[in-house]
Curated annotation (Swiss-Prot):
Keyword Flavoprotein part of the UniProt annotation: yes
One Pfam family per UniProt: FAD_binding_3
Residues involved in FAD binding: 8-22
E.C. designation(s): 1.5.5.-
Protein's recorded name: Probable electron transfer flavoprotein-quinone oxidoreductase YdiS
Amino acid sequence: MSDDKFDAIVVGAGVAGSVAALVMARAGLDVLVIERGDSAGCKNMTGGRLYAHTLEAIIPGFAVSAPVERKVTREKISFLTEESAVTLDFHREQPDVPQHASYTVLRNRLDPWLMEQAEQAGAQFIPGVRVDALVREGNKVTGVQAGDDILEANVVILADGVNSMLGRSLGMVPASDPHHYAVGVKEVIGLTPEQINDRFNITGEEGAAWLFAGSPSDGLMGGGFLYTNKDSISLGLVCGLGDIAHAQKSVPQMLEDFKQHPAIRPLISGGKLLEYSAHMVPEGGLAMVPQLVNEGVMIVGDAAGFCLNLGFTVRGMDLAIASAQAAATTVIAAKERADFSASSLAQYKRELEQSCVMRDMQHFRKIPALMENPRLFSQYPRMVADIMNEMFTIDGKPNQPVRKMIMGHAKKIGLINLLKDGIKGATAL
């Protein structure tokens, strides 16, 4: 390892860490990325779907050479009970505007490619090394300690993922609140491209993204997801960490039951399990965003809690990339000023406030509280399924008007509850 002082050391080679290194290296900064895994992305998990707009701004036309899987053209949202599914299906032609596109990705392919772009721009990358501590002189972070080695830098960017222990060691990241996190589990199941296209009604390199609420998380806060890759599908679920103690089954068992659901089982029939992973997921929204800047240090990506689950979209990577670009731009400007103090690095927060990151985090700040409503994942999926079942059942008895069907099932939840939940949902979204 070099004894020289770096302009910046980035801890973590996920999407945020790699992009931060790329932007700084392009500007001629001396950048080192340290990753505890054996390669970039090997410790990371996502559903996963990448909304292209932020990476497109940094690497125009990236999808031509990047190892993306499929461009998403089919969107599905389902409410599941144990035996039924009510599904909204939206299909569109592939967007002509690259910034409007989104892609399914596998992190063990995407992240090494991103790190390769950073290295080609001049960044140094050291995998398989754990950063044990941050080095400080007084209140200022001046580098990192890895084993017996101390590496110095003007700025350290923490891209070490959700529940950042290094951020916590500085007092920047508070103790974990279980209601701010979820546990995610995922399987990658191999299928042929022809099977995928036939089963999901897509063609060529089109992709499908499918979100589920209700039975996948056993009626608790959370939900399921399915993304089509080139020759596999990513199938998994998340369950709120604060709800797991009340669950009737383990998270792995939830996934097994999800795979056996009548709406899912035919889609994965004959598939081969290629990968299993589990990970913590930030779900707290704006309320869990920690102190982002201190003397000589900034926090980006999942470590900063930049994730938005709106129920119909789940965003993390695009926000991580935007935060990484903001942090990198700040370091570049700080070097020009020869000022790496907290007041100088506060430009990072201003950059975030002008980007989609804090604007969207602020706009949807009420979503996490909305998602804690247990009726969203238990009673409402059941109500929708029961209404649809009654509408489509013809048994020789006189049919009720649809309005009476709906009102009868709505009363089971309570009209006041429906009104309160509707108002809360409208104000949150």
